């Protein structure tokens, strides 16, 4: 191909492959929401290899301000094409909610200084799983309140009322992430 003035090269010619692409250890990184609960790292590796997009910035701003009690926006629906983008956004938000030390290094200063809460409690549900205690039992278990939800699943599934959810969640900053719900709802 002629690489004269004004002619673009191919993607292969124009880009360099990052060495991380060939690093098989990347499979050890957080790949799904449930890893947020058990991961021992602080999330810095995740953000070192990811670029913060405008969409991520908007989600971080609104979601973290809600956790700080500075926004009334309580639910966020991520409507994106398939391919992991939604899960990626939720993992990123979960890491920032869980690890306050990341916030000053990842977030704009005007946002980070407004976040007056420590580590948020996180419940992360992946609908490709099928827990015996149903989605609400799994969420309550991750929040350390399995005892309060047990009556709603032990003798067969029953809906959990708003008052019980308020008791389970309490006043502590709490982030509940739900991913891949259609497969769960089909079961």
Where are these regions (language model features)?
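Extended hydrophobic secondary-structure segments that form protein cores and membrane-embedded regions
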Residues: 76-84, 119-128, 175-180
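Flexible phosphate/Mg2+-sensing switch loops adjacent to catalytic phosphate-binding sites
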Residues: 94-127, 148-160
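Intein modules and their embedded homing endonuclease domains
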Residues: 68-77, 95-102, 122, 136, ...
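Hydrophobic positions on the alpha1 helix immediately C-terminal to the Walker A/P-loop
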Residues: 89, 93
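Mid-core helix/loop region of P-loop NTP-binding domains shared across ATPases and GTPases
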Residues: 147-182
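Walker A/P-loop
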Residues: 87, 133
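Conserved ATPase-coupling elements of RecA-like P-loop NTPase cores
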Residues: 184-187
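Walker A/P-loop-proximal flanking segment of P-loop NTPase domains
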Residues: 2-84
């Amino acid at each position: 191909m002629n690489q004269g003035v004004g002619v673009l090269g191919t993607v292969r010619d124009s880009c360099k492959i990052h060495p991380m692409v060939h690093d098989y250890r990347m499979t050890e990184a957080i790949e799904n929401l449930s890893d947020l609960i058990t991961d021992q790292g602080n999330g810095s590796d995740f953000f070192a290899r990811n670029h913060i997009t405008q969409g991520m910035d908007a989600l971080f701003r609104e979601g973290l301000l809600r956790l700080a009690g500075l926004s009334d926006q309580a639910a966020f629906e991520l409507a994106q094409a398939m391919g992991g983008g939604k899960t990626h956004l939720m993992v990123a938000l979960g890491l920032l909610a869980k690890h306050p030390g990341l916030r000053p290094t990842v977030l704009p200063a005007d946002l980070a200084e407004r976040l007056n809460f420590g580590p948020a409690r996180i419940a992360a549900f992946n609908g490709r799983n099928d827990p015996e205690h149903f989605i609400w039992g799994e969420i309550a278990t991750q929040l350390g309140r399995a005892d309060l939800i047990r009556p709603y699943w032990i003798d067969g599934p029953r809906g959990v009322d708003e008052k019980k959810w308020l008791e389970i969640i309490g006043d502590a900053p709490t982030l509940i992430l739900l991913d891949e719900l259609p497969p769960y709802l089909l079961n």
